[in-house]
Design a protein with these regions (language model features):
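Acidic, proline/glycine-enriched N-terminal capping motif
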Residues: 1-95, 100, 330
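Well-ordered mid-protein domain cores that form the structural environment of catalytic cofactors
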Residues: 75-133
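Conserved, structured C-terminal
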Residues: 1-34, 40, 110-473
Length: 473
């Protein structure tokens, strides 16, 4: 990891904090901007102009290199890396022997037998250190900056910032460009569901690149994005289930096969395992941890499970069986406004009535509470509520948010396929066991919930193309 503190973008003088009104203590010495203009304004920018975010600067980054790099990745991931080209990437998934997701993230190819992974650590480091293959792993966390530009104006902003044409960059590909002679990697990828890009480069060059992008972005009406507006308000309406947001990971519940010893490894490296260490479980699912773990099929990623690839890989036997049953899928759930109001009204019925848990929060990501609980040695809070068809449990609801662009309360549901038809009337049980519980009617809605053209389907030929005569002054 980066050892030079002067190269950190988290220094008090960093332009990262310019305009921030609240900060979030993510880790010792690392404060993330929590809000700039507020969640309503920041999240909505992706649907009209764009937002510029830096939340993923804290990403676990891990390089895999060596003659057997492809074989190693194929043995631990559901994906097939044997034909990955020099400009390509994979949305990689690691599973345990039950077929449950252990982590997922992006893998890009940097060179022959050299791959960079995002969010696959710590499982990937544990597996590599216990592998007999000719590979080596290097933790690259905090050595590169990670800037996201998401929204309808994102391509125009990026082209004007680097003064070059990026219209040829296809979805899920990357290439190198420069700003004022500084090399950076641009990836066409994002979490809002619509047109979006990522920019990566040496951490020492963050200030110059970030200031340039923000300066150009301001002219296009872009907004800086804080942590509060990042997770739920983008991933849930964008139709992207996300680790550590919509579901926990079974890092301490997978002591079989190649994962035997992982719990001890994480106990020795608690800073790597804190997302799933001493979890606090809320919502009507209660302490039923197994119900919260998901498979690739539960979250709609069956296309990323390559059962036909040569060789064995972690979870293949279970995933083969799950593919045959393929019982659950992911949907958007639209919450009934009157029922939500009824739950909220319990807060106002006097001291003789025990109120339900608050439902007026903008999103079910407990940043403030997590900061306090982690300082006390407790774990991250995960909420999941039970979904019913009539009185029959059919799955869970997670990632509840108020979407201010559509003026709706929505969540993602991992539910039985037989009840996943758009328009189906279901209900969610609101309330952690031991607190008052109420049914809230929900309706299955399209996934993703938003109406934007998805990034992978977006034809950018209608986006104004940068040319030297269009240079901003």
């Amino acid at each position: 990891m980066a050892s030079d503190p002067t190269s950190s973008p988290f220094q008090p003088s960093s332009s990262l904090y310019q305009g921030a009104t609240l900060l979030y203590p993510f880790a010792p010495g690392i404060f993330l901007p929590y809000e700039y203009d507020g969640l309503r304004v920041e999240a909505a920018a992706a649907r009209t102009t764009a937002w510029i975010g830096t939340q993923l600067m804290i990403s676990p980054i891990y390089d895999v290199k060596g003659p057997d790099a492809v074989e190693f990745l194929n043995s631990i991931c559901t994906n097939d890396f044997s034909k990955l080209g020099p400009k390509g990437l994979r949305h990689a998934i690691l599973c345990n022997e039950k077929g449950q997701i252990m982590t997922d993230g992006v893998v890009i190819k940097l060179g022959e037998n050299h791959f960079r992974t995002y969010w696959l650590n710590p499982p990937i480091d544990f597996l590599l250190k216990n592998s007999n293959l000719r590979v080596e792993g290097t933790d690259q966390s905090l050595t590169e900056y990670f800037i996201q530009i998401a929204g309808e104006k994102s391509l125009e902003i990026l082209e004007n910032a680097c003064e070059g044409d990026l219209h040829d960059l296809k979805f899920a590909t990357h290439r190198t460009v420069s700003i004022d002679g500084k090399q950076m990697r641009v990836i066409r990828l994002g979490m809002t569901g619509n047109l979006a890009y990522e920019v990566h480069g040496p951490i020492q060059e963050f200030e110059d690149i970030y200031q340039r992008i923000c300066s150009v972005g301001e002219r296009f009406g872009a907004r800086k994005l804080g942590m509060n507006a990042y997770s739920g308000p983008n991933h849930t309406p964008g139709g992207y289930p996300n680790i550590h947001i919509h579901y926990p990971l079974p890092w301490f519940e997978s002591e079989t096969g190649r994962y035997k010893g992982l719990s001890a490894y994480l106990a020795q490296n608690p800073q790597l395992g804190w997302f799933n260490l001493n979890r606090q479980l809320t919502g009507s699912v209660g302490n039923e941890l197994e119900e919260r773990f998901v498979t690739p099929y539960d979250v709609g990623w069956g296309n990323l499970v390559k059962l036909e690839k040569s060789g064995d890989f972690l979870g293949k036997t279970a995933l083969t069986e799950l593919a045959a049953s393929n019982r659950r899928t992911v949907v958007s759930l639209e919450w009934n406004a009157d029922d939500v109001a009824s739950v909220y009204a319990t807060q106002l019925r006097g001291r003789d009535t025990q109120p339900c848990e608050p439902i007026d929060m903008q999103l079910d990501m407990y940043y403030q509470a997590n900061a306090v609980s982690l300082n006390k040695g407790d774990g991250v809070i995960y909420r999941a509520d039970r979904v019913l068809a009539g009185d029959k449990p059919i799955g869970i609801s997670t990632g509840r948010v108020i979407d201010y662009h559509y003026n709706r309360m929505i969540s993602l549901g991992f539910i039985d396929k037989t009840n996943a038809t758009i328009g189906s009337e279901l209900s969610v049980i609101w309330g952690t066991p031991g607190t008052p519980q109420k049914k809230v009617r929900v309706k299955v809605a399209k996934l993703p919930y938003h109406d934007s053209v998805r990034n992978e389907e977006r034809d950018v030929s209608d986006v104004p193309r940068w040319a030297p005569q269009s240079r901003l002054t």
